[in-house]
From Swiss-Prot:
Function of the protein: One of the early assembly proteins it binds 23S rRNA. One of the proteins that surrounds the polypeptide exit tunnel on the outside of the ribosome. Forms the main docking site for trigger factor binding to the ribosome.
Assembly and oligomerization: Part of the 50S ribosomal subunit. Contacts protein L29, and trigger factor when it is bound to the ribosome.
Name of protein: Large ribosomal subunit protein uL23
Family, per entry: Belongs to the universal ribosomal protein uL23 family.
NCBIfam families (alphabetical): PRK05738.1-3, PRK05738.2-4, PRK05738.3-2
Keyword RNA-binding on entry: yes
Source organism of this protein record: Sorangium cellulosum (strain So ce56) (Polyangium cellulosum (strain So ce56))
UniProt-listed HAMAP family: Ribosomal_uL23_B
A Gene Ontology BP annotation from the UniProt entry: translation
Membrane-spanning intervals of the chain: none
Pfam family, one: Ribosomal_L23
Length: 98
């Protein structure tokens, strides 16, 4: 798999991801369910040019959603919590110092 196919999107707008980013130099990504920790680590290092110390993965259970009168289940997805090397940082937005 190509690195672009492994990493789906960063999860940056939650309280937990903001807290982990500020306290522990960790970043959260949604990744493909088939990807393992080694592939995720290599993809992050290739795409963002940062050092990765650790990768923790979780399978998130899909939610039940209302569809008309019935319910449909969303797919399960995989979340990766990536610990970056001390001093490395990933900028998702162009942050201006004010």
């Amino acid at each position: 798999m190509q690195p672009e196919q492994i990493i789906r999107r960063p999860i940056i707008l939650t309280e937990k991801s903001s807290r982990l980013r500020d306290q522990g130099n960790k970043v959260i990504f949604e990744v493909r369910r088939e990807a393992n920790k080694i592939q995720i680590k290599d993809a992050i290092q290739t795409l963002f040019k940062v050092g990765v110390v650790d990768v923790n993965t979780l399978i998130m259970r899909g939610k039940d959603k209302r569809m008309g009168r019935g319910y449909a289940k969303l797919r399960n997805w995989k979340k990766a919590i990536v610990t970056l090397k001390e001093g490395d940082e990933i900028q998702f937005f162009d942050e201006k110092a004010e």
